[in-house]
Amino acid sequence: MKPLTKNNLVAIVGKPNVGKSTLFNRLVGKRVSIVYDQPGVTRDRIYENINWSGKNFRIIDTGGIVVSDQPFVEQIRIQAQIAIEESEIILFVIDGSEEITSDDLYIASILRNSKKKVLVLANKLDNNKNEDYSIYSLGFEDYYKISSVHGEGIGEVLDKVINLMNFENDQDEDLFKIAILGKPNAGKSSLLNALTKQERSIVSEIAGTTRDSIKSTIEIEDQKFFIIDTAGINRKSKLVESVDHYALMRAMGSLDESDLSIIIIDATEELSHFNARIIGYASDKKKPTIIVINKWDLIKKETNTMIEYEKKLREKMPFISWMPIVFISALKSQRLNKLEKVIIQVKNNLSREIKQNLLNDLLVDMQTMNPLTFKGKKLEIKHIKKTNDPVPTFLLFVNNPNIVHFSYLRYIENQIRDYFDFTGCPINLVLKKNK
């Protein structure tokens, strides 16, 4: 068995209709996966966080694996294979009330070849159903009888999971988390090595040489940060036809987990669909974001090259106006000090406190310069207040929330940004009816 990789990921795998999604929903304490008595309902991997006995880890739900050459079944198999590759513990769910099938044996073979730690969960053994003892011939060490519907046996499984994991460096989990994201071979690992000043990732011309998500800590201006270098996919594997799609899904998972995302674009290439999607996802999710243009040393430069590049990028994606753009060469460690300063700037902006009298002045100026009237009704913003949420959030107490158009909210956001530095931070505006 391979040593555990300290990525705190647990995958739920199995054939269709054995109760994987029911188990997943019970573990996370809410309905996330669709539960339906039909094979193939869960098509994509779904990630959620779990806390058990004070320990945090992530769990992945996957679609059912069967022996078939149907296209959608193959996509599910690929999804599950990726989940197996990136996880350190596998929960192999089978229907304990039925005989072992060829699909169960096929999955067992995949799991044995993965060399990962596997816990076999014989589900649906409630209501005094008879157990099929052939499950013990699957070739694994740990077997548990559970009922995902009623929760029986789940606690024992979770106890085993946290006992298998390495939580020695759990204090790092409380640090400010930065995810390094980007298309394979954009320079994610080179940037990680430059920031940590040590070789943590293999740097190669071959895309996808980072096989596991690598987590490191760095210090900038005496502040400690937790860095996640998103895993790639081996280009030589059978998953090659779907590399970009699944790399994107992994990037989205890392972005969800992070406090700040650094999205790397290769300066020598055109803006890819991959980068456009992940930047758009960061914007939609309102995630603090820095865009890094890497390999800038390879670009033939003129006086305004950097300015022109940034201008064109912002024209292509107008929604990134609040995201800073930093030009670097990770391999040659050029302009990394600039990137480090921007990281500190964004972190400070996220926790920026604003005195109420300054917000009151802003409120007066906004309504004086650009009052809003809609169908004869005048908008009156009575009060503005900043909350303590992780992302800068402002409550606007108004006389009539229904007449506020999104364009006026954009005007308010722009005014806030003109008054205060929120570089790299999304801004939430919440309308409240003034009482």
UniProtKB/Swiss-Prot annotation:
Q: Which GO terms describe its biological process?
A: ribosome biogenesis
In UniProt terms, what function does this protein have? GTPase that plays an essential role in the late steps of ribosome biogenesis.
- How would you summarize the oligomeric state and partners of this protein? Associates with the 50S ribosomal subunit.
* Alphabetical list of NCBIfam families matching this protein: GTPase_EngA, small_GTP
| Boundaries of every KH-like domain copy | 352-435
Statement: the UniProt record of this protein carries the keyword Repeat: yes
Q: Which family does it belong to?
A: Belongs to the TRAFAC class TrmE-Era-EngA-EngB-Septin-like GTPase superfamily. EngA (Der) GTPase family.
| A Pfam cross-reference name | KH_dom-like
Q: What is this protein called?
A: GTPase Der
Annotated keywords: GTP-binding, Nucleotide-binding, Repeat, Ribosome biogenesis
The entry marks the following residues as binding GTP 1, namely 14-21, 61-65, 123-126
One annotated GO molecular function? ribosome binding
Give the encoding gene's name.
der
Q: Which InterPro entries match?
A: G_ENGA (IPR031166), GTP-bd (IPR006073), GTPase_Der (IPR016484), KH_dom-like (IPR032859), KH_dom-like_a/b (IPR015946), P-loop_NTPase (IPR027417), Small_GTP-bd (IPR005225), VWF_A (IPR002035)
What HAMAP family does its record include?
Answer: GTPase_Der (MF_00195)
PANTHER family in alphabetical order = GTPASE DER
Note the superkingdom of the native organism: Bacteria
Residues annotated to bind GTP 2: 182-189, 229-233, 294-297
Task: Name all EngA-type G domain ranges.
Answer: 8-169, 176-351
